[in-house]
């Protein structure tokens, strides 16, 4: 009788537990499910720039060289990419409508970054570890009679005991020079996008990342300086030497500049590069065949001519050759 009652009590507890689990599952099903994060699915999401604190001309910003990134603040309705390192204090409606997509860097860029990281390493810890491994793996030296003392202690007052102390000099190579100024050599534009490419000085100071400064300017004559229409926007930590600016305004002029950065700091901004998007005219050309224009330029080369003392002529010789 007692066993039967105990069996019934056990069945009742099991039924209560099943009922509680069922109620808990129903409560969990009624909770709103979290949205799936598309940023974790696609790592090639484009990023947006940050507005600078003050409004001014891009040329003035480059001359003063006092550009500071805004401090990152949490924004609830921000739709920036997860790759972006900082978010501005403005709401998402005031963020830069211009998007930037970075292409995959070439092998030379990664080679320069790898060379810079290897230069930071110190060879002294490696030598010290190798020495410790040799001591650990090598044969144990036989203790001399002078080292044998009572209870295994070492007699430091024994003059026969010879001790040596040596220190290794730590040698580390750290980048101390700032990176060179990039040179923008090509751009391809249509009515809403622009692909900008610049050079990377291989074999010189390594580059960790680039910064790009962009500003919309009013159309002016060739000899006039561009007039700013709004505040500049900056794109930070760009890996690679080619970027694609998207969602630009048609028939609009832009001005941009690029600078490199490494462990020593940031380099100088390059000269402002001016380009313009094409006008949207579907009456002349169909939408299925958009027109794009590519502009390339070469970096100016400087030639240094040295003249020795033996090649220089005296003043009287010049007067004889070129009489007045």
Curated annotation (Swiss-Prot):
Sequence ranges assigned to domain Fibronectin type-III in this UniProt record: 179-280
InterPro entries associated with the record: FN3_dom, FN3_sf, Ig-like_fold
Any Pfam family hit: fn3
GO CC terms: nucleus
Highest rank taxon of the organism: Eukaryota
PROSITE patterns: FN3 (PS50853)
PANTHER family noted in UniProt: FIBRONECTIN TYPE III DOMAIN-CONTAINING PROTEIN 8
Protein name: Fibronectin type III domain-containing protein 8
Provenance organism: Homo sapiens (Human)
Species classification: Eukaryota, Metazoa, Chordata, Craniata, Vertebrata
Gene name of this polypeptide: FNDC8
